[in-house]
Amino acid sequence: MLRTIALALFVCTVLVFTLAHTGSAAYNPTPTPFVEPEGCWEPPADYTREWVNGQQLNKRTLAMLDHAQALYSAQGGVLDFRLGLTQGSYTGALAASFGTHDGGGAVDLSVRSLGDFSIMTAEIEPMLHALRLAGFAAWLRDTGDLYPNSPIHIHAIAIGDLDLSAMARAQIDGTFGYLRGFDGLPQVDGIPQVDRHGGPILCQWMLNQSFYDLRGQPVPFATVGGTTQPLPKLP
């Protein structure tokens, strides 16, 4: 009887500790068994830079973007990813991006119609799914998510890109990262925000490069900023 009571108290203590550090049970998702989804394709390790629609990307990122386009278009998608580029890589000194676009592997995409500038709401989830399947950590940044009246767009970081800035890499597997089931945005209170678009999509090539489903795993280097990087000053 005493052992049963002690066990119950232990379980309750663990539950209280978990909720206190995560805010809710939603912040402690668990990984699912790995089954490689159809459409996975390992990008080439080509870091030659080129300009596309006024934005600079390396060829690895561009190949991933084009693969995502093919996946998305095959499902009836109507937006053009190259034409929709609003920010590329290697663009430092942009405060709103808090360093994520300073290196390679980062892209922002418009979700608006080129015809009438309306938000193409029905295209957003198919775009995100295709980008994630192609190897990006990708999320919708809705209006006002980053600062008052910040424009709606998709933000994507190429998993495994060797040119990633430290802040971009943190969005993949840092405290607030995609592979941990979160939205990639550092929070002043230190509590990660759950990914609104579901869990990460993994391919075998990502596992081969040691990128795993980290949901529910302890976070290394748990500094104030959530990674080895200091917490940036958000606008």
Locations of regions flagged by a protein language model:
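Positively charged n-region of N-terminal signal peptides that target proteins for export
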Residues: 1-4
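Bacterial N-terminal signal peptides
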Residues: 8-18
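Cleavable N-terminal signal peptides
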Residues: 12, 23-25, 108
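Ser/Thr-rich, Proline-interspersed low-complexity disordered segments
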Residues: 20-36, 221-235
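Secreted/periplasmic proteins that engage bacterial cell-wall peptidoglycan
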Residues: 27-146
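Catalytic cores and adjacent binding grooves of peptidoglycan-active enzymes
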Residues: 49-55, 97-98, 114-232
